[in-house]
Amino acid sequence: MSRNSPLQSGQRGPPNGSPYPDSSQNNDTFLSRIFGLNSVYNHLQENYQYYDPEFDSTYNQQVLANSQRQDYDLFGNGLDKTNLLDSESDSDLSSSSSASPSVVVKPRFKRTEASDNEDDEVDDLLTSLSKPRSSPPRRKPTFNIPNARDIFSANGNTQATSVLPLYNQKYRKPVERDTGASAGDSRGYANSGIRRTNGTRFVIPPKERALYLWANITNMDEFLTDLYYYYRGKGMLNIVLSSIIDLLILVFILGFTVFLKWGINYRYFFDNYKDSTYITLADLIIPNFLVDEVPLLAKFFLFGFVCYIVLRLIQLYFNYNYKLKEIKNFYKYLINISNDDELMTITWKTIVERLMLLKDYNSLTSTTSHFDGATDHYINDLNSKVRLNAHDIANRIMRKENYMIALINKDVLDLSLSPFQNSSFQLINNKSVLTKTLEWNLKLCINNFAFNNEGQINPSILKDFNRNQLAKELNSRFKMAAIINLILCPFIVIYFVLLYFFRYFNEYKSNPASIMGLRQYTPYAEWKLREFNELPHFFIRRLQLSVGPANTYINMFPRGFLVINLMNLVNFISGAIMAILVIMGLWFEDENHSFWSFELTEGKSTLFYISIFGTLWAITSTSTSTSDTADNLNPNSHSFVYDPEASLRYVSQFTHYLPSSWNRRLHTVEVKNEFCELYSLKIIIILNEIFSLILTPFILWFRASSSSGAIIDFFREYSIHVDGLGYVCYFAMFNFEEKDKNMMFDLNKRKGKSKRSRRSKTSKTSSKKTVNEIELNNIKSKRREKAKISDSEDASSLPNTSDDESGNDLNADTYQDEKMIKSYMYFLESYGAGKADVRAINSNNKLLAKNSVISNIDPSPSLIIQGPSDNHSLLDSAYNINYKFDDAEQEESTRPGKKSGVLGMINQFYKQDLGR
């Protein structure tokens, strides 16, 4: 769906004609999708008085000059100058009776009349509201947005303020089109013919700009996402510098590679080196090698990289000028974070709390009645309001990631290597095949297809009759991505090999064992271990806390006597040879002779062999010192307890991953090997990334494309509409009371089959009925135990039934409920929920887990937290979930993928990789 690209605050209109563009004009162009011009937060009004950001630097001087002449209050006469966050939560944004034009909240009236009569009804409504009423007087507004034209001018005169126009101008008083209005008129901003004359320039104070931005947001998802990534990027300066450094690294790798390949005369170097001729680097550089030596194909790709770098620089400029500056202004004046350095210490929970205090200052999120006589005025429907609490903010930021988490955990994506995998080659398995490269391609193909430009799910996916057509389109999208990856594969492989070499060489030189011995979680493990609605910084912190316990658990298992003894032998021999060479080099060193340059073999000096044997000694010594035998771990020490089972359970407190298949086997090597597939060696992950560049085209063509129908079905069946939030993933709503209708139908169908099979087998004897009752009680007790944070060890003690396949399906659905419970409990912990709330949730979850096995009633609203309600609590929402897909609300949008382009998708996913 194309979006209008509104003018930013720093743009000016043409001097003649209508200086402002029509809001209905389609500005979705190729360049706008690349540079992000269509991704702004609010659409400014047609008659809004624009200003020049270049004069913002004089704002403090103007305030100082005006304060010396008159003590003017920016927040209305007679009101205290208090911080916005300290004001009342139900503050009124409407103008006072003396302000013109008045801001009227959108009424609720039945659209039963013809469209031609709507304007007359609005005019009658506005006329009636402008007349004096006998109803109780309105409350005095606690906040009033002044007009910048009337506050600051060149002559320094201050005049009466007026309210800036809100986004919804349909229910505002019609603006006057009198072009002869004086500059001092309080309604001057409504005139489309106003121009700057006689050198008069107007500016809007930064705080009012931030308030206007917040009051007129139309894309809450994008604004909150940018707000979060600004917090995660630690401020504007760090974000800009990081982007510039990334581009400089790219330029250096390209330039340095081209110089080493075509810029040096290696033949001249080797010929003169053998003859001991004195040469310098200037003698080896080929003049004009870019023109004469570089092949035409390489020049073509270099030109493409140059265009890409230029586009990235232009994109960075627009992001800085139109996004980062506005976000910085918002943090400074509304979130009350004056310095970006504070973002390094402040918690996200605090930012969410301060953001929630602003909900009454936005027409989309405000739920406060602004008039005492509320019955005499039209008010907005609260059910359509945009929700704004910790859960809603996380759902908006993680809307796409929640679907990806569910796709990986439910094994919807088939990424197996069965046609290519060799049993003797176990470097790449089905879990390690998901690399960053493949992950980026999957996001590029799925997210840009399933979601529109507004961040919402495309309505066509939610309709069952579009399933086959959409599956074909997604299949074609996967195959197109495979072709592009196959064409670019040689160049991407060379680039990443050089990138990894330059990045890790210094680390390898200083600590050779760091590359061979360090472990980290694989990309597959990151999606498998991530909870729903878990923001990236929470997830990264949780994984970092698990690194130490995970290493301790792995080191408890012996690697094998052959490997340990062989490494001890290599360590001793390499250390002995290196020691002799170093001693001889120090002993025979004088002015005439240098043992360091002595050639032990032809062309190889002593220093070469010292570096080789030193590397072997460092690697083997580190490996043997951290070997996982009981002797090396010193069991006599009081700080060590050799208990792999307890260690793995401690690791699961951070990873939240302890599948039931591991129960009773936590001490075995098989479980340790399965865990090592998730927590693998860093060198293996790097090799997998390089091999994945070659395998990605085949996986996309043969495997991912075959899952197109399952992906479409997943988005249709596991999408829930929430009023004020839109369509979100079912598992992200933490709805434990009931499952979705589609899920419930499949689960009841499988349970019905298992019950019928058990009845047929137990109808002969009454003793078997007793066994089945015990079985059902065990299943119920299992569901209650699985509602806890850690997995129950008694899950594997269930009696074995003949219908193992249906039991496995039931356990799979049970695991999804369990993961939702874990995600919800960790969500409460991350945002500092009280113990009383946690106890209430635990008590509810026990009942819900008990009833979820035999529940067949219609779906009901999601879990409501017990306890006193607080409008400003982080978790104060009870969602009204609408499971019915209303076709009237599902307007046919642009076919997915038609207007997003490759470069536009690259721009969309670039900010998701910041901070990785």
Curated annotation (Swiss-Prot):
It is found in: Preautophagosomal structure membrane; Cytoplasmic vesicle membrane; Golgi apparatus membrane; Endoplasmic reticulum membrane. Residues 115-124 have a biased composition (Acidic residues). Residues 1-238, 315-481, 503-568, 627-681, 703-916 are cytoplasmic. GO terms for cellular component: autophagosome; cytoplasmic vesicle membrane; endoplasmic reticulum membrane; Golgi membrane; phagophore assembly site membrane. Phosphorylated by ATG1. ATG1 phosphorylation is required for preautophagosome elongation. Residues 482-502, 682-702 dip into the membrane without crossing it. One of its GO terms (biological process) is autophagy of mitochondrion. Keywords: Autophagy, Cytoplasmic vesicle, Endoplasmic reticulum, Golgi apparatus, Lipid transport, Membrane, Phosphoprotein, Transmembrane, Transmembrane helix, Transport. It catalyses: a 1,2-diacyl-sn-glycero-3-phosphocholine(in) = a 1,2-diacyl-sn-glycero-3-phosphocholine(out); a 1,2-diacyl-sn-glycero-3-phospho-L-serine(in) = a 1,2-diacyl-sn-glycero-3-phospho-L-serine(out); a 1,2-diacyl-sn-glycero-3-phosphoethanolamine(in) = a 1,2-diacyl-sn-glycero-3-phosphoethanolamine(out); a 1,2-diacyl-sn-glycero-3-phospho-(1D-myo-inositol-3-phosphate)(in) = a 1,2-diacyl-sn-glycero-3-phospho-(1D-myo-inositol-3-phosphate)(out). Residues 1-27, 86-150, 747-814 are annotated as: Disordered. Residues 92-105 have a biased composition (Low complexity). Phospholipid scramblase involved in autophagy and cytoplasm to vacuole transport (Cvt) vesicle formation. Cycles between the preautophagosomal structure/phagophore assembly site (PAS) and the cytoplasmic vesicle pool and supplies membrane for the growing autophagosome. Lipid scramblase activity plays a key role in preautophagosomal structure/phagophore assembly by distributing the phospholipids that arrive through ATG2 from the cytoplasmic to the luminal leaflet of the bilayer, thereby driving autophagosomal membrane expansion. Required for mitophagy. Forms a homotrimer with a solvated central pore, which is connected laterally to the cytosol through the cavity within each protomer. Acts as a lipid scramblase that uses its central pore to function: the central pore opens laterally to accommodate lipid headgroups, thereby enabling lipid flipping and redistribution of lipids added to the outer leaflet of ATG9-containing vesicles, thereby enabling growth into autophagosomes. Homotrimer; forms a homotrimer with a central pore that forms a path between the two membrane leaflets. This is Autophagy-related protein 9. The lineage of its organism: Eukaryota, Fungi, Dikarya, Ascomycota, Saccharomycotina.
